[in-house]
């Protein structure tokens, strides 16, 4: 995964001849993400709280031919797109998967947002609810900014989660299935593993929002520094913790699984009614299982200083 870096200067070509300049494209992507975080008015909690929604981004890359994308048809659902299917849905072009790269990113919630939500025990803090609604609107804008920047550099890209064909629907076995799961895509791109409450634990923790695009370019993939899809979770990897179980206000998280219906009912109508009544805007959210837990802001560490991934706490 990559810390965001300085990008190309204005007018600097991102392509060398007919071949994509991998380094220039990578710099461009990470520059656009950093510019969004530092300067975009879309990175905002909205309303009277004129603060950024996000900080500390990370970017990861995965080959469109990575076999794990096919495995997501089992893990998420048979309707989950491969990168080639997503690119075809957005462009009408049939492109070999090895010619595509999935670019995924992590946007960390701000310390103030996390601190506020840490204090709650039933409903979301206002900053958290604003992050969920207005922050996600900004994240959607980042998808568009990246696609536009790549297009101007001669690289076609699509944002699967913004395509009109994208669906989220009920499933008798999995409760809800989607055409493109940002959590699972980020996992493939080396950005994190899953926790007991199903959130993705990243180097920026679990109190994050995620996004991704599919680009018609071959970029170096990010190594996956884990062996299993739950490696960073202290409960799954060490048999300890379970803090998110205690944080869930409706008992939807347990050591034997997650009651997704109970969680969904708490979100809507439960938190929606609360947010509209108390904060005065149409929104919802919870995130209690993502805050006030060891994996809130990092890959968690045990008392002996060892991380769930097996190394030092960092």
Roles of regions detected by a PLM:
Residues 120-314:
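Catalytic cores of enzyme domains
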